[in-house]
Amino acid sequence: MPTATLLPVIGKPAPDFTLPSTSGESVSLKQFKGKKSVVLYFYPEDETPGCTKEACGFRDLSARFEAAGAAIVGVSANDMETHLRFKTKHKLPFELLVDADALVSKAYGVWKAKNLYGKKTMGIERTTFVIDKTGRIAQIYPKVKVEGHVAEVLAFLTED
């Protein structure tokens, strides 16, 4: 089984990417540079309990993230059709990106070996990155536990 790459380092440039999004347009990290911070959250799968709770948590506080000057962007390996259903059903006001070949997940070090019902598989380990307006990693939340996570990220963005 392939080995996972390491997480990026706080203070270093975030790996750039361009991925298809639920807007119908491609989204790249560089389009936010100089304009907004980015909350880039990687999650395993649309419509699973933890992923739904996390997405809805970001949805519920999205106006506060916007007020803090941050864009929320979700990434998983699900296909566009699944993302669109998930976004519509839960009224998510932010884009979901399709990382079908896991290249971006690997670049961010979140594509990991997992044990699913006794079967070894590769998948996304729930992780959130805060990327500042200069395109550098400002904070990393690895192995995210959903409960309280969204509030923790917002607190980081709004602390003095």
What is the predicted role of each segment?
Residues 1-160:
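Chalcogenol-based redox active-site neighborhoods
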